[in-house]
Amino acid sequence: MNMFVIAAKSEGKYLYGYHPHIYSNLKQAENALKTMRKNGKLTERDKVYGLDGLMLVDL
């Protein structure tokens, strides 16, 4: 996995929302998520997902 995004996903295939930035490093994505949660921009349902083409992959 070399691309990561921050998103909120339902139990099915649907997205509630996503942050429009693609990270090439898992650690960068996790740090960004932590910072945005602290600033109140994201909630606990948002998390880091790996991208496989255009599909979200749970990590």
From Swiss-Prot:
Protein name in UniProt: SPbeta prophage-derived uncharacterized protein YosB
Q: Which organism is it from?
A: Bacillus subtilis (strain 168)
